[in-house]
């Protein structure tokens, strides 16, 4: 059952680049357009999460501040189109979003301070969120500057030490069991055989940088999932929603459900109950522009949501 009220997660931006809110200051909301997913809450405050991963079409324009007062976006789902099979280094994307990473880090710290973070006895959220994120961010940024190919996890020198050794040996051993289960679930339902010998996983989840333990685990698991590949546009969509779901779950979401709103248009709604004092966050997505794989991948997404729910 979803609770009513207001909460601190009423904000917008991409996972790696929070462009719309900084404290109480609004800078404008990205449009509901190609390459974005709309999110709404029951208090009619629109939230937009643009798909800024390199595997999504970028939204270049911004709508004026008045968008906030235009009402509930519940019936205005986003249509995502574009090429979701991107490969190659994502260095530019990461470097351009350094400020956004810091904003997301600040958001996480605020949530922790309000009791959404490391307060449980089973170590679901560790007290090292900020420290680990900062520890990994600087070395990884330096690797980027040195010419890392993020798609292969190896630097220009070809050793891969910057990602594989640092993340796997130094970070994963300090992660909580809960986060490990989340990441196991994160990858479980989207493992496809690579058709050309490599994976585009990195470009699909690169926007998770700066979010604390979860992004470190995504990084550490990268070397173990090289067979994972974005084989179609519909796969790209659900890889993105999967990552976003994991991110919100990490912040304390009580996972909701996937609802079909319009079978003919293949229009779906994903509801997440964030916290007891918050309205539910509602994702809406219209997948009617695609012709195959929708129902199959939605079943996978539902399984993922259920798995997260069982972990709580």
UniProtKB/Swiss-Prot annotation:
Polar residues bias: start-end ranges: 74-97
Organism: Rice dwarf virus (isolate Fujian)
Chief location category: host cell
Family note: Belongs to the phytoreovirus non-structural protein Pns12A family.
Keyword Cell wall biogenesis/degradation among UniProt keywords: no
Protein name per the record: Non-structural protein 12A
Biased composition (Basic and acidic residues): 63-73, 122-134
Region Disordered, residue ranges: 1-37, 63-97, 114-162
Summary of the function given for this chain in its UniProt record: Constituent of viral factories.
Location in or out of the cell: Host cytoplasm
Swiss-Prot/TrEMBL keywords: Host cytoplasm
Higher taxonomy: Viruses, Riboviria, Orthornavirae, Duplornaviricota, Resentoviricetes
Biased composition annotated in UniProt, kind: Low complexity: 1-23
Superkingdom of the source species: Viruses
Cellular-component GO terms for this entry: host cell cytoplasm
